[in-house]
Amino acid sequence: LNKQIKIGFSKIGGIYVGELENSKLHKHRAITIALSFNDKFEFEGENQKITTSGLISQPNTNRKYNYNPNTLIAFVHIEPFFSLGSTLLNKDKEFEELVTEQTKEIAEILMQWCNTNDNSEKLTETVIENIIKQIATETPQRFIDERIKKSIDLIWNSEQIDLSELASINNISIYRFSHLFKQETGISFKEYVLHKKLIKSLQAIVTDKETLTTSAYMGGFSDQPHFNRTYLNAFGVPPGKSIK
């Protein structure tokens, strides 16, 4: 079990394909597409449990996955405020099952990606965009407040930037900016920065082949235990059991 096939990263999201142990209840900050290549799995949301071959979960919602042994599973985590990600946002549904045709098309895209030696960020981004198009063909894009969109770009492109700096850049009070940020993203500024640290650490592990400890520091965590807790809260499994 816990056989990792391939992991990819890009600015707009990441992909994991492999075998995993059942997850604990967790809450991820990204939009998540989960699908199985060879067997159905059990998904548990806030108030509902289903058995499915594929589904999409909204950001900041609780979810739990249970699989049969040797189930080959894929997770596509999509940043909701970059590129086409916003076309998948749906405030009315915590999750939605994929139709059979969507699951097949996405599985085919992912298998082609798995079978190539290219693991560049550019290819991962192209794969994610192609997957999004399988689901969001006619969905109108949800527009985010331009000040928050600009602030999110600054958060990702800056080593360190705090709430007061972003409030000042946007010419509003810290209180107003903090409220606006949560209103637009669904989470606090502090929670979003923690999400960014997690993704930066994962990139160091997968792309730079760094150790968990070194990657935790590279992402901005004060120590590895903090990284481990954040990872478990986001993915429902410990890092040592899902990334190598």
Where are the regions a protein language model picked out?
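Localized chelating/binding microdomains
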Residues: 54-55, 66-67, 77, 148, ...
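DNA-binding recognition helix and immediately preceding turn/loop
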Residues: 144-188, 210-218
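N-terminal regulatory/effector-sensing and dimerization cores
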Residues: 2-93
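Amphipathic alpha-helical segments enriched in hydrophobic/aromatic residues interleaved with Lys/Arg
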Residues: 87-153
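Terminal helix-turn-helix DNA-binding modules in bacterial transcription factors
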Residues: 163-164, 183-224, 228, 244
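Helix-turn-helix/homeodomain-like alpha-helical modules used for DNA recognition
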Residues: 2-5, 20-23, 222-235, 239-243
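Short, Lys/Arg-enriched N-terminal segment that forms or immediately precedes the first helix
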Residues: 15-18, 131-139, 182-186
